[in-house]
């Protein structure tokens, strides 16, 4: 079904409705799909032995109003959903939050061993705060229900806060792992000297 849907999208406007599943199955039914997803444009497509890999560019949050199946794949009637931006995005507290998540996201990328210039190139490519929160959320390892929760958080400020918490948690995890590694190395060094 998914391959047929991709083929159909490629023949028309290249738009798909990307939505997460509650259960991992090859043939999803509407009842296991979350209602909110993203209208996305198919960018690159790579076909390989393991199937098809797509690069999707998210364009707009949307909610599925109705699903139907025709020609072997599922289609959806969707309604776009607007995010809630702060009344004043030059509010000092909002600007500070946006700056903090940018700095912590860069730190996380570098701690994961990515080259600094690559991290900054990716992060600097998005200036709009809501899109930035979405970009960072895409790089964070989270269970599907948590990622879905971020997608459904329409307040940009709240989404930035929630993503920042996840980023800080992952930095803390990496710090703890580095600490454990260094303790193990120390113990190994002491044992070798004995």
Which residues does each predicted region cover?
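N-terminal low-complexity, acidic/polar interaction/targeting segments
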Residues: 1-194
């Amino acid at each position: 079904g998914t391959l047929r849907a991709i083929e159909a999208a490629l023949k028309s406007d290249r738009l798909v409705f990307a939505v997460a599943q509650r259960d991992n199955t090859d043939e999803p039914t509407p009842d296991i799909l979350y209602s909110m997803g993203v209208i996305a444009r198919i960018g690159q497509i790579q076909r390989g032995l393991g199937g098809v890999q797509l690069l999707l560019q998210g364009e707009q949050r949307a909610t599925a109003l109705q699903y139907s199946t025709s020609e072997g794949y599922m289609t959806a009637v969707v309604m776009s959903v607007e995010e809630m931006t702060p009344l004043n995005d030059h509010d000092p507290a909002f600007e500070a939050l946006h700056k903090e998540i940018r700095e912590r996201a860069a730190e996380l990328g570098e701690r994961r061993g990515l080259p600094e210039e690559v991290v900054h190139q990716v992060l600097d490519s998005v200036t709009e705060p809501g899109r930035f929160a979405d970009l960072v959320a895409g790089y964070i390892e989270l269970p599907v229900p948590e990622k879905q929760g971020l997608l459904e958080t329409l307040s940009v400020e709240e989404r930035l806060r929630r993503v920042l918490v996840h980023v800080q948690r992952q930095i803390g995890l990496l710090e703890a792992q580095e600490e454990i590694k260094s303790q193990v190395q120390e113990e190994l060094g002491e044992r070798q000297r004995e």
